[in-house]
């Protein structure tokens, strides 16, 4: 995507000196903007209005109340494109222990119910966040079922997968009384690409997809693609111990993220989905 001078002139910035594309995202166009006195990170969603970024802004503010996140400068619409303007953060190195403590601090933020005060349906994977008092109901109906139905639409589902998924779903609902869950604020997409360390070594959480749910969902995501080491888990456990049996529950939460990748990237993730489904 090319940003014209006319487009850039509508940003709430003065004296823009340089604009550099930034790689790494597959959803938004991203740029580093350098002015005379400051640097900014700009996300642009082509042909999508400002509401596309409302969910991310809300998430950054919720997380930012208890841990470091990029500061939101502005969001809006230019021409037909939604944009989100953030502070540019120079990166450094930091400790996994500090990251684990930061995530635990986020999870200590609780709510009376599971969900969020708004849905997010502008992306490729709809997030239905209607409030629920029962976690198993929320997770099966508003997370897993949504992605399974999407996989069916994408012709990525089979009778075998449906049979095993039905068994998993029933077990989650039947066994919900065995696992007491307190609604925690979740990052929602906690993989290694969504944290960094600033130049002081402070952990920074980015690109959130927040809601209130079982904190083991965030922890499950950390186990799928790597990027979190023993120090992270030890620091997390010291700050907010997990309930016994978490290792047995993690696959059912890993399934959500693997279903997301199945829908986004296709059958490459099918074997990983099947490995979990076949346990039921």
From Swiss-Prot:
Its EC number is 2.7.1.-. One of its GO terms (molecular function) is kinase activity. Keywords: ATP-binding, Kinase, Nucleotide-binding, Transferase. It holds the Pfam family Fructosamin_kin. It is an enzyme of class 2 (transferase). The keyword Cell membrane does not apply. It catalyses: N(6)-(D-ribulosyl)-L-lysine + ATP = N(6)-(3-O-phospho-D-ribulosyl)-L-lysine + ADP + H(+); N-(D-ribulosyl)-cadaverine + ATP = N-(3-O-phospho-D-ribulosyl)-cadaverine + ADP + H(+); N(6)-(D-erythrulosyl)-L-lysine + ATP = N(6)-(3-O-phospho-D-erythrulosyl)-L-lysine + ADP + H(+); N-(D-erythrulosyl)-cadaverine + ATP = N-(3-O-phospho-D-erythrulosyl)-cadaverine + ADP + H(+). Coiled coil: none annotated. Belongs to the fructosamine kinase family. PANTHER family: FRUCTOSAMINE 3 KINASE-RELATED PROTEIN, PROTEIN-RIBULOSAMINE 3-KINASE. This is Probable ketoamine kinase lp_1983.
């Amino acid at each position: 995507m090319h940003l014209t001078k006319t487009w850039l002139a509508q940003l709430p910035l003065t004296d823009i000196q340089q604009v550099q594309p930034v790689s790494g995202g597959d959803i938004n166009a991203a740029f580093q903007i350098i002015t005379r006195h400051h640097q900014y990170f700009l996300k642009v969603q082509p042909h999508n209005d400002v509401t596309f970024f409302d969910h991310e802004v809300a998430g950054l503010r919720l997380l930012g109340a208890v841990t470091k996140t990029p500061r939101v400068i502005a969001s809006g619409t230019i021409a037909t494109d939604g944009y989100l303007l953030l502070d540019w953060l120079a990166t450094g190195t930091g400790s996994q222990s500090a990251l684990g403590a930061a995530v635990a601090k986020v999870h200590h933020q609780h709510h009376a119910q599971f969900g969020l005060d708004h849905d997010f349906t502008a992306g490729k994977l709809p997030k239905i966040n209607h409030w629920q008092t029962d976690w198993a109901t929320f997770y099966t109906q508003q997370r897993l079922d949504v992605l399974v139905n999407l996989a069916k639409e994408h012709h990525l589902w089979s009778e075998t997968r449906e049979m095993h998924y039905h068994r998993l779903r029933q077990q989650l609902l039947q066994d919900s009384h065995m696992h007491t869950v307190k609604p925690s604020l979740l990052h929602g997409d906690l993989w290694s690409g969504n944290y960094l360390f600033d130049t002081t070594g402070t952990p920074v959480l980015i690109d959130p997809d927040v809601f209130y749910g079982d904190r083991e969902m965030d922890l499950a995501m950390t186990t799928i693609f790597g990027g979190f080491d023993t120090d992270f888990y030890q620091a997390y456990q010291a700050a907010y111990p997990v309930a016994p049996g978490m290792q047995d529950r993690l696959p059912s939460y890993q399934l959500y993220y693997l279903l997301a990748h199945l829908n986004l990237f296709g059958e490459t993730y099918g074997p990983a989905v099947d490995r979990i489904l076949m346990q039921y």
